[in-house]
């Protein structure tokens, strides 16, 4: 694990974005951990979050021209990632996001920010069912752009209804690469290294054994 990944896990724990316990997911599964990126909700939180997204993006070394943040959660993520890339990597990257409702007055349309053209890096918090990604793909295609990759905070590495995870399905269906700041495997490595969270480690491993992707 890279230093920024360890720091991100500790940041998520500190802000209670990452919690351990018993949580019922939309899928109906009972998960021993829960990740709620909406709790990164102050200016300082967002500034730090952007640095982690930017670090993961630099680490992945994927070519892209524009950051796209799907409404609504992707909007602040795209914004703070663009700021972090400028501040810490001297990269002035255009960013764009969509409105849920088309505007009839002013500049009109559903897109705000830069033009959506060239190679697009889509940024979001997590991929649960892949629905938001599929909606974003329609917007990207409508604008004649190409999806270069998808960047999220956490990859749960968890099967969907079939054997593949939602992320693996997105990679297959859109012939793209999904990168994440951390994966479930990183979280398990972190718990193992701490030695003080053995009860959480056991339940997370059991959950992975039952629902994890191969």
From Swiss-Prot:
5-phospho-alpha-D-ribose 1-diphosphate binds at residues 26, 72-73, 99-100, 103, 105, 124-132. Belongs to the purine/pyrimidine phosphoribosyltransferase family. PyrE subfamily. Keywords: Glycosyltransferase, Magnesium, Pyrimidine biosynthesis, Transferase. This is Orotate phosphoribosyltransferase. It is an enzyme of class 2 (transferase). NCBIfam families: pyrE. It catalyses: orotidine 5'-phosphate + diphosphate = orotate + 5-phospho-alpha-D-ribose 1-diphosphate. Pfam families: Pribosyltran (PF00156). It comes from Pseudoalteromonas translucida (strain TAC 125). HAMAP family: PyrE. Pathway: Pyrimidine metabolism; UMP biosynthesis via de novo pathway; UMP from orotate: step 1/2. One of its GO terms (molecular function) is orotate phosphoribosyltransferase activity. Its EC number is 2.4.2.10. Catalyzes the transfer of a ribosyl phosphate group from 5-phosphoribose 1-diphosphate to orotate, leading to the formation of orotidine monophosphate (OMP). Orotate binds at residues 34-35, 128, 156. InterPro entries: OPRT, Or_phspho_trans_dom, PRibTrfase_dom, PRTase-like. The lineage of its organism: Bacteria, Pseudomonadati, Pseudomonadota, Gammaproteobacteria, Alteromonadales. Its cofactor is Mg(2+). One of its GO terms (biological process) is 'de novo' UMP biosynthetic process. Homodimer. GO terms for cellular component: cytoplasm.
């Amino acid at each position: 694990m890279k230093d920024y990944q360890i720091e991100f896990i500790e940041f998520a724990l500190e802000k209670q974005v990452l919690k351990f316990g018993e949580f019922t997911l939309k899928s109906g599964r009972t998960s021993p951990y829960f990740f709620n990126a909406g709790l990164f909700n102050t200016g300082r939180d967002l500034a730090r979050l952007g640095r982690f997204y930017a670090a993961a993006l630099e680490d992945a070394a994927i070519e892209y021209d524009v950051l796209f943040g799907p409404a609504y959660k992707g909007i602040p993520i795209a914004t703070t990632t663009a700021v972090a890339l400028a501040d810490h990597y001297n990269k002035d990257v255009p960013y764009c996001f969509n409105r849920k409702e088309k505007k009839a007055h002013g500049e009109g349309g559903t897109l705000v920010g830069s033009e959506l053209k060239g190679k697009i890096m889509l940024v979001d918090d997590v991929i649960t069912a892949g629905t938001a990604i599929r909606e974003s793909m329609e917007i990207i295609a409508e604008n004649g752009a190409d999806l270069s990759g998808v960047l999220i905070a956490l990859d749960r590495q968890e099967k969907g209804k079939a054997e593949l995870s939602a992320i693996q399905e997105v990679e297959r269906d859109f012939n793209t690469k999904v990168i994440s700041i951390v994966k479930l495997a990183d979280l398990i490595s972190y718990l193992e290294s701490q030695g003080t969270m053995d009860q959480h480690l056991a339940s997370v491993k059991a959950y992975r054994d039952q629902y994890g992707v191969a």
